[in-house]
Amino acid sequence: MEANHQRNDLGLVALTMLAQYHNISLNPEEIKHKFDLDGKGLSLTAWLLAAKSLALKAKHIKKEISRLHLVNLPALVWQDNGKHFLLVKVDTDNNRYLTYNLEQDAPQILSQDEFEACYQGQLILVTSRASVVGQLAKFDFTWFIPAVIKYRKIFLETLIVSIFLQIFALITPLFFQVVMDKVLVHRGFSTLNIITVALAIVIIFEIVLSGLRTYVFSHSTSRIDVELGAKLFRHLLSLPISYFENRRVGDTVARVRELDQIRNFLTGQALTSVLDLLFSFIFFAVMWYYSPKLTLVILGSLPCYILWSIFISPILRRRLDEKFARSADNQAFLVESVTAINMIKAMAVAPQMTDTWDKQLASYVSSSFRVTVLATIGQQGVQLIQKTVMVINLWLGAHLVISGDLSIGQLIAFNMLSGQVIAPVIRLAQLWQDFQQVGISVTRLGDVLNSPTEQYQGKLSLPEIKGDISFKNIRFRYKPDAPTILNNVNLEIRQGEVIGIVGRSGSGKSTLTKLLQRFYIPENGQVLIDGHDLALADPNWLRRQIGVVLQDNVLLNRSIRENIALSDPGMPMERVIYAAKLAGAHDFISELREGYNTIVGEQGAGLSGGQRQRIAIARALVNNPKILIFDEATSALDYESEHIIMQNMQKICQGRTVILIAHRLSTVKNADRIIVMEKGEIVEQGKHHELLQNSNGLYSYLHQLQLN
């Protein structure tokens, strides 16, 4: 009745869904009590105030249909008649709109005409204030500004060294001018000796300072690299499980590897070339003193370099994007192939896999070759501009010398100075591919670093839990346009109760436990432990107090002891052994040559499936969790190992709330209560013998199938 009443106020329904989309929990009745004063539903003003009270930033705008693809979605389409709906996605290519019908509680795809018929031009954009802060601090080139400020002393020293290098670079052409115009004309050998010694000293200082600058600069950029690498890994592990489920492993690895491109850029010559370019105004002043005409030729060439770069950069960026996409495909396919090597060998499909790899590799090589060709064209264009300027300067300079406006020494000095100006420009022009590549790398890496983590401000770390669990009016789907996985699930589990959950595949059994671990937040309803809403709880605090054993568990390439004591490496050995005995793992571990110090190999490859599963059970038990989840945990065990586990089940369950998910009904028949699920709903519950009495029930049907 309450759900139907809430469904009548579509504004309240929309607010609830948008708040939960932004990981904010709310009580609809409390919102209704505070803001729906006349009982007619939330008005526009009341809706905006209610959103503000939830730390949401909501803005009412009027937007033409043709510009809807530019707004941040999902957004609420506000209707004066109260028939509000959510706009989830705009498909501009096919003129279609993915919406969410709040009345029917289902996603809808509308054509252009259908959308125009119901759209009144009013939109409410919603974002969380935490995400606004995250967007302001997003990872891009500006991320390096605080790092530069942090190491400003080192960069200031680099700047000072660069100034001295430019002064030395200025002195050398002057020495050559003196030699050409004075020493050679007047045969001044003593002056020549002095200039030679001075020039040697300048060269030595220049080499030392240049090496010192490179060392100091590389040292500081290495620190920034360490900070970025550490930040990246911390952020990666803090991302919600949905981030990884929606992306290929190889694609994520490829994005993380883009850090290498940024590292090479930071420690390369590009940034020092920028510093050298900044001091070019000093050389221009001296060059102007020698010859304004020749200086104007040099100045006139600079826009040519810029225009050439502007012309070719967008093309290169598209080619680099394509190259990255092909590289990510290769990375994903390689990871998938190595991970599934047993299946590939067993099915003898290596030729087919090789054929697919060859095609993908050819596609990558082709895209890489196109990048190389374009980069070569760009570099040759730069060389053409440089050679053209050199010819013009030679012709004009010779005319000035012949007419007596310039001496030979001054012409040589001018050419040396112009070389000092053009050299960093050419280096940057030749490194423009690196700039483009780094820009792509920063964007790709930003996909990881700009994704919101699970850690939100204001999350509560509550006292040690007791084990009471409540699922209230739970409705959940993995994506807005995906089918409903859980629908109106209500379940109370008492502290210390052993609950079995059974049902057909896809009935929502495992999804229920994922909500309990706060991997996801329900679309509607609440998950509570000891009366505390998990949407408000710190995920790390919660998961440390829940033990989970899955059907396929992953062991790290460490010793058995380290795998069991993963959450607390300093754990006493007695606790590790006790947990291993409970899990039925101690006996086979003791028979190994190195016992608990045996390295299990990558993903536990050195152990059998049953052995890996028992170690995983020991790992879940070692922290003495108050809530224990067995999700098909014994399905991979042989009968002897399963018998050992079932014998110890009374000890395992003692003082804990236990949830057993199983297809084999023998695993759950001794549970205090058995929950039967079908199509996301609870259809039966009771003890084993009680459920068998209902001959028309699903549990009885599954029991008969297993008996037969």
Swiss-Prot record:
Its main location: membrane. It is a multi-pass membrane protein. It catalyses: ATP + H2O + proteinSide 1 = ADP + phosphate + proteinSide 2. Keywords: ATP-binding, Cell inner membrane, Cell membrane, Membrane, Nucleotide-binding, Translocase, Transmembrane, Transmembrane helix, Transport. Residues 469-704 form the ABC transporter domain. The chain crosses the membrane at residues 159-179, 192-212, 270-290, 296-316, 389-409. Its EC number is 7.4.2.5. One of its GO terms (biological process) is proteolysis. Residues 155-437 form the ABC transmembrane type-1 domain. GO terms for cellular component: plasma membrane; type I protein secretion system complex. It is found in: Cell inner membrane. Residues 1-126 form the Peptidase C39 domain. Part of the ABC transporter complex LktBD involved in leukotoxin export. Transmembrane domains (TMD) form a pore in the inner membrane and the ATP-binding domain (NBD) is responsible for energy generation. Belongs to the ABC transporter superfamily. Protein-1 exporter (TC 3.A.1.109) family. Homodimer. PANTHER family: ATP-BINDING CASSETTE SUB-FAMILY B, BLL6336 PROTEIN. In LktB the peptidase C39 domain, the ATP-binding domain (NBD) and the transmembrane domain (TMD) are fused. This is Leukotoxin translocation ATP-binding protein LktB. It comes from Mannheimia haemolytica (Pasteurella haemolytica). The gene is lktB.
